[in-house]
Regions:
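N-terminal Sec-pathway targeting helices
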Residues: 2-24
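N-terminal cap/lid segment of alpha/beta-hydrolase-fold proteins
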Residues: 27-73
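Short beta-strand element of the alpha/beta-hydrolase
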Residues: 72-80
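The serine-hydrolase catalytic nucleophile loop
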Residues: 81-91, 107
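Conserved alpha/beta-hydrolase
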Residues: 92-112
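Active-site nucleophile loop of the alpha/beta-hydrolase fold
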Residues: 107-108, 159-163
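Gly/Ala-rich beta-loop-alpha elbow adjacent to hydrolase catalytic centers
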Residues: 135-144
Length: 163
């Protein structure tokens, strides 16, 4: 009996250690995956920032608004998967130069799928905007379209995808 109990105890310990190792490997791989992303080109952002006069407002830690005067059109942008949101800053400033209020949202771990509802509440902050558009690059575009389909709001979708 004692031998049987020892074998059973060893088997349980081996099983538990195996599960812990598998969880650790999966967690480590996930951490490496989400921390390996495309970063913004700081030279492009600096160059564009010096030649741009659009008012920039930070709504919260994750949301930047590029607000031209007297804008009547707004554009909420979801960044592509594993792309640093500031990489889209020159694009947002260029659109704002054309009179469009642009909202750029940083996604958790640079994955829009983790916060599909990031646009929620933004549009109500700007009642002067008559037409709203929502879109994004790649995974961000897909999540913007998913958000729109669930909200059934009077928005237009600009969904950009690259593969």
């Amino acid at each position: 009996m004692n031998n049987f109990a020892n074998k059973r105890k060893r088997r349980i310990i081996l099983w538990l250690v195996s599960v812990i190792v598998i969880i650790a490997v999966i967690t480590g791989a996930g951490a490496i995956y989400v921390n390996d992303y495309y970063r913004a080109d700081s030279n492009a952002i600096t160059t564009f920032a010096t030649s741009n006069t659009v008012f920039t407002e930070t709504l919260d830690k994750r949301t930047v608004v590029y607000a031209p005067e007297k804008a009547k059109t707004g554009f909420v942008f979801y960044p592509g998967g594993k792309v640093e949101y500031t990489a889209y800053e020159p694009l947002m400033k260029a659109c704002a130069d054309k009179g469009i209020l642009c909202v750029l949202i940083e996604m958790p771990f640079n994955l829009a799928v983790l916060d599909m509802n990031a646009a929620e509440g933004i549009m109500s902050r700007y009642p002067e905007i008559e037409n709203w558009y929502i879109g994004g690059h790649s995974l961000g575009g897909s999540m913007a379209a998913s958000y729109l389909s669930k909200m059934l709001m009077n928005l237009k979708v600009l969904s950009c995808s690259a593969h």
